Amino acid sequence: VEVTPGEDSRAIVVDLGDLATGLGRGASVAIAGVCLTAVEIDGSRVRFEIMGETLERTTLGNFQAGSEVNIERSAKVGDEIGGHRVSGHVAGRARISKIERPEGNCVMTFVCESDWMQYILPKGFIALDGCSLTVVDVGNTPPPGGASWFTAHFIPETLRITTFGIKKVGDEVNLEIDPETQTIVETVRRYLESHGPQHLS
């Protein structure tokens, strides 16, 4: 990554390698799980412009020259879809609070704003830095220092091909809520607010 700061924005240049093949100006690319638009292309080097709101909501404002990022091109009709649908519309950030490495596995615990936890459910989907993951467990740490948390497991292959292999405690990641889960939770919540729980059967 190369970074050019602006007054209320910044531009980054990312070397996409082979993923730049066939990429056109105006195409969408997920950088660390954030949907960005390619504005200039020079071989495998692609320039993206990032507005102030995106910098505030995501971790892109923390990027420095030489940073490694997860990259994903947009899906095409007919592509195999593994995991769940990821749009690149980031809700906010989560922070790694613990990393455990049992044999042949890696378990990371993340903390985030409590408002998002209503959409983060055990065995549900979540996207972190653009990686489709399954939530293993959720909970709340009691005060003092209480926080809402969730865990995800990483197999060695995921650690190898993504930046999670170099993450450490305290690092922040971009958090995207599964839109289907969010829709269901919001629909039920609004129904209960309008009709009350006595109408459920």
Feature roles, as predicted:
Residues 1-201:
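Conserved loop->alpha-helix
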